[in-house]
Amino acid sequence: MKIKYQEKKDLVQELKSKDACAKLVCETDIWKIYSITTLEASKKYGRDTKWCISGTDNTNNYYWQQYIKYGIKFYFLITKNNYNARGNDSKYAIIIIDNKYYEAFDQQDNHVKLNDIIGIDNVVIPGVNLATLQYKPMFINEGPHL
């Protein structure tokens, strides 16, 4: 279904409202890092990935709700200028659990560790100390999988 906008300002307002759910929290020479707070933002910024919370089928809402139930925070790293960070990955998802643990995924939905992501040393996420987070892929067997 195509949406027709009566005026350009209507389109601009629509785009701004969708972006309100994804906040740019850090920008480096390589990355733009977004805090993702809604399913709509996850689908928009996670486009062209295999992340279950960013897909276009009906299951993405289920997975999103399961993660939210656990109080998980989502951050998407998106490369600038098509910089190829690792193989073909230009996007990474980082989930933060209780500001103690993390899981990270490449575009193909494979687990990665933070130190495997080029340029992660320059990434600053407000309120999160990436250096002290422990890698804990808890959701492989215990619950939903990103």
Cite the ranges covered by each PLM segment.
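Catalytic-core elements of nucleic-acid end-processing and repair enzymes
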Residues: 1-146
